[in-house]
Swiss-Prot record:
Gene Ontology biological process terms from the UniProt entry: symbiont-mediated suppression of host innate immune response; symbiont-mediated suppression of host type I interferon-mediated signaling pathway; type II interferon-mediated signaling pathway
Free-text function comment from the UniProt entry: Counteracts the antiviral effects of host IFN-gamma. Acts as a soluble IFN-gamma receptor and thus inhibits the interaction between host IFN-gamma and its receptor.
Signal sequence region: 1-13
Superkingdom of source: Viruses
Sequence similarity: Belongs to the type II cytokine receptor family.
Organism of derivation: Vaccinia virus (strain Western Reserve) (VACV)
InterPro entries documented for this protein: CR4_N, FN3_sf, IFN_gamma_rc_D2_pox/mammal, Ig-like_fold
The protein, known as: Soluble interferon gamma receptor OPG193
Quaternary structure note: Homodimer. Interacts with host IFNG.
A single MF term (Gene Ontology): cytokine receptor activity
Induction data: Expressed in the early phase of the viral replicative cycle.
């Protein structure tokens, strides 16, 4: 009688054995499978071109499982197999190079005495305790990203896009220097060229307000010179004593005249 009961239980389990949902996702080559199904399963993986299956997990219930260490070649397809008794099901993946998603870069702004540095750190894969930048590595599909940085200055709501040249990049990240006296905010996005067509999410926005050690005034044409002269006159009056004010005011007047003359000459050259 006991044998009949055992056989009946095994028969019932085999009837209900079924994978009801399955999902594979790889972000920065951190690869996971998520699945639901009744009972416990043995899970194995086979790469294209290799006959044998690699056992990944034994007698495990539904859930999310890391399989990052098992696909041996990032450029070929592979299969994930679930087994419970006589029930078997295989799930196909076109390969990590096609399926992998790349996360956003990390953006840092650093102020120096005479400039601000924008540093864009490449997204990275985690291998054990090591963080390995995703940049022109054969074991990561030779992926490298070309970045676009969106700058916003002062109170402006319209971003100014700037494409980062790959010559400004190393194996760890990209670096450019720029100058502004206004508050600046930056966010960056990476994208690949070619058939893989990877596009990252935008990075978190970072902002920096420079220390105002320099007074500035934009001059685009000679019509802007009076505004420049008025602004600098206020600076002279508020920052310097009367003896210095007299000298600096004369210097400001002659400088303003020289700038006006120079801009007028440029304008004549432009239309000649």
């Amino acid at each position: 009688m006991r044998y009949i009961i055992i056989l009946a239980v095994l028969f019932i389990n085999s009837i209900h054995a079924k994978i009801t949902s399955y999902k594979f996702e790889s972000v920065n080559f951190d690869s996971k499978i998520e699945w639901t199904g009744d009972g416990l399963y043995n899970i194995s993986l086979k790469n294209y071109g290799i006959k044998t299956w690699q056992t990944m997990y034994t007698n495990v219930p539904e859930g999310t499982y890391d399989i990052s260490a098992f696909p041996k070649n990032d450029f070929v397809s592979f299969w994930v197999k679930f087994e419970q008794g006589d029930y078997k099901v295989e799930e196909y993946c076109t390969g990590l190079c096609v399926e992998v998603k790349i996360g956003p870069p990390t953006v840092t702004l650093t102020e120096y005495d005479d400039h601000i540095n924008l540093y864009i750190e490449h997204p990275y894969a985690t291998r054990g305790s090591k963080k390995i930048p995703i940049y022109k590595r054969g074991d990561m599909c030779d992926i490298y990203l070309l970045y676009t940085a969106n700058f916003t200055f002062g109170d402006s709501k319209e971003p100014v896009p700037y494409d980062i040249d790959d010559y400004d990049c190393t194996s760890t990240g990209c670096s450019i220097d720029f100058v502004t006296t206004e508050k600046v905010c930056v966010t960056a996005q990476g994208a690949t060229e070619g058939f893989l067509e990877k596009i990252t999410p935008w990075s978190s926005k970072v902002c920096l307000t420079p220390k105002k050690s320099v007074y500035t005034c934009a001059i685009r044409s000679k019509e802007d010179v009076p505004n420049f002269k008025d602004k600098m006159a206020r600076v002279i009056k508020r920052k310097f004593n009367k003896q210095s004010q007299s000298y600096l005011t004369k210097f400001l007047g002659s400088t303003s005249n020289d700038v006006t003359t120079f801009l007028s000459m440029l304008n004549l050259t432009k239309y000649s």
